[in-house]
A protein has these predicted regions:
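N-terminal lobe/hinge region of extracytoplasmic solute-binding protein
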Residues: 4, 60-109, 140
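Bacterial lipoprotein signal-peptidase II cleavage site
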Residues: 23-31
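Short, well-ordered beta-strand elements
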Residues: 54-64, 113-116, 166-168, 200-205, ...
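Gly/Pro-rich hinge or "lid" segments in bacterial periplasmic/extracellular proteins
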Residues: 76, 94, 170-238, 342-343, ...
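Aromatic- and charge-enriched surface segment that lines or borders ligand/interaction sites
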Residues: 104-146, 288
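Append "and occasionally in soluble cytosolic enzymes with long acidic Gly/Pro-rich linkers
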Residues: 212, 290-396
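Ligand-site clamp/hinge motif
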Residues: 216-261, 404-406
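Detector for C-terminal structural segments
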Residues: 301-332, 386-395, 420-540
């Protein structure tokens, strides 16, 4: 099958499988809808003063003591602007489609053996033409980086043939494989260089404190700035102060994470979507969640819209299906049937045999004819305030239904230990999905995952149902897009109706600039400076 280079390839299942979920002190049972973002809109609110320019230059935070190498990816601050210095093999757009300005054509008949042809008119900043060997080398080295390793684990082998062609063999068929190759390109042999050569529109100055236009780049003349200045503001308080004083002009914040920072109100705030999915997971060996009815009932009791709009301050997109709502694979009509509905939750619990057998106002269940009091052990990682608040809300909603639930807010180490030991009935989780939307690692039966018995994988549900993995494999191997879409609908229905996991929402990130400084922003999860040539920067 042949693919033109700039034809969007709709992305499907993904997973880098970065779990973050639940946290510390025990909390008793008495404790206590956003549309896809329009990137050039700002948060409505109180009118604020116009920004007073500090220096009439555009500056970003960076870490001068860390490597600039985007393949080693050792500094989150320096990774924020990597796309200004380096091209990537493929680019993932905000609508989860994929394109490339480096790869002119790619072919695969079985989605295992892939052949890629590159544009050799592209040059590094020293004038050296880009070669297939450079691209293959960058991907090979990225496999060794913890930042990219999970998504590139699919690769069995890679090699270059001539100056403009390289081939990749994957371990299994994946029609969405190019979506995983959002990998920066460095020159062959530069992996251990802290400032490797790149082909992007900018290059690092000799002093290392600014980005200057790369005269070899085909888009250099389209860039909105001749120079982007870099300032060392790695100290948190210094970074906040520098932004408020306009010494730096753009910051990215994760309002749902443990490093959420507070910036003042004299800003314009834009959001961009991510593939980080929050969800509820269940221990299928727990006597409370042996049935799909009991698990699905919890889904009806979770007010996703309230969690996103109130507890996450709009920094999320509510979802009931295991794919981002902005994806073409998200079936809105089907999803609405599983939205927040306490009445449906009560009916589902009743169908699962959960009732008030002793008329004490709390629900019980029958186990071999014996009335058993409910006391669901719900765990969450305490490192994230947003996750803790969401878990508390869900705990509260279950208790209001008479489902006695106790929330345990655990440190990260204790949380992971509890998951591995199965010491939970329900957990609040997060997973960073890769842009092929592949969640099979959450369901793969453990005994067949690895010969390394110390590695248990992420099947914390302890399901032995091979149906999930089979559905994902069928979907990833489909030749035609229409068949892939139908296969993904089958995945969504199977996950939703068995309730092994219950998606809650997808995170969004904040991109903050000073008022009136930047327009035309179309940031993505993978590239803050996506389409930077279309930005307008005003420093007057």
């Amino acid at each position: 099958m042949r693919f033109p280079a700039k034809k969007p390839l709709i992305l499907i299942l993904a997973l880098t499988l970065l779990m973050t979920g639940c946290a510390g002190a025990r909390t008793g049972t008495q404790q206590a809808e956003e549309p896809p973002p329009v990137y050039d809109q700002v948060i409505p609110g109180t009118e604020v003063k116009e920004r007073q320019p500090a220096d009439h230059v555009f500056s970003l935070n960076y870490d001068p003591n860390a490597s600039m190498n985007p393949v080693r990816a050792e500094s989150s601050a320096n990774m924020q602007f990597w796309s200004l210095l380096y091209d990537s093999v493929f680019t993932v757009d905000s609508d989860w489609s994929v394109r490339s300005e480096v790869v002119t054509e790619w072919t695969s008949d079985d989605f295992i053996w892939w052949v890629f042809h590159i544009d050799t008119s592209i040059c590094f900043s020293d004038g050296t033409p880009l070669s297939a060997a450079d691209v293959a080398y960058s991907i090979q080295r990225a496999q060794q980086s913890s930042y990219y390793a999970n998504r590139l684990d699919i690769i069995y082998g890679i090699s270059a043939f001539g100056s403009d062609t390289f081939a990749v063999t994957t371990k299994y068929a994946n029609s969405q494989f190019p979506a995983l190759l959002n990998i920066p390109i460095i020159k062959k042999g530069d992996y251990f260089e802290d400032r490797p050569l790149g082909t992007g529109p900018y290059m690092l100055s000799e002093e290392g404190d600014r980005l200057i236009l790369n005269p070899e780049n085909r888009h250099a003349a389209e860039m909105p700035l001749d120079t982007v200045y870099l300032r060392d503001c790695m100290d948190t308080s210094a970074r906040i102060r520098a932004f408020e004083e306009a010494a730096i002009d753009l910051v990215v914040n994760d309002p749902t994470g443990m490093y959420n920072l507070g910036y003042g109100s004299s800003n314009e705030t834009r959001y961009f979507d991510t593939s980080n999915m929050h969800y509820l997971g269940f221990n299928t060996t727990s006597m409370y969640f042996l049935t799909a009815a009991a698990r699905c009932a919890v889904g009806f009791a979770a007010d996703r819209d309230a969690i996103v709009s109130t507890l996450m301050s709009g920094c999320g997109v509510a979802a009931t299906l295991p794919v981002h709502p902005a994806s073409g694979y998200y079936d809105e009509d089907y999803a609405r049937g599983f939205a927040f509905n306490p009445e449906n939750a009560a009916v589902m619990f009743a169908n699962a045999g959960v009732r008030d057998y002793d008329e004490d106002g709390q629900l019980e269940m029958l186990v071999t004819g014996i009335v058993v009091e409910l006391n669901i052990r719900f765990i969450v990682n305490s490192d994230s305030t947003a996750k803790v608040l969401a878990a508390r809300k869900i705990c509260e909603q279950l208790n209001e239904l008479g489902i006695t639930t106790t929330l345990y807010e655990l440190t990260w180490a204790d949380y992971i230990a509890a998951l591995e030991a199965g010491e939970f009935d329900m957990y609040y989780g997060e997973i960073r999905m890769t842009p092929d939307w592949n969640l099979s690692e959450l369901f793969r039966p453990r005994e067949n995952r690895s010969k390394d018995l110390t590695f248990q994988g992420m099947n914390y549900a302890q399901t032995r149902d091979y149906g999930y993995v089979d559905l994902y494999e069928k979907y990833l191997g489909e030749q035609e897009e229409s068949a892939r879409r139908e296969d993904f609908q089958a995945i969504s229905r199977y996950i939703t109706e068995t309730g092994i996991i219950l998606p809650l929402c997808f995170e969004r990130r904040e991109l903050l600039t000073h008022r009136g400084v930047a327009t035309g922003i179309s940031a993505t999860q993978y590239d803050v400076f996506h389409n930077f040539n279309e930005w307008t920067i005003n420093l007057e």
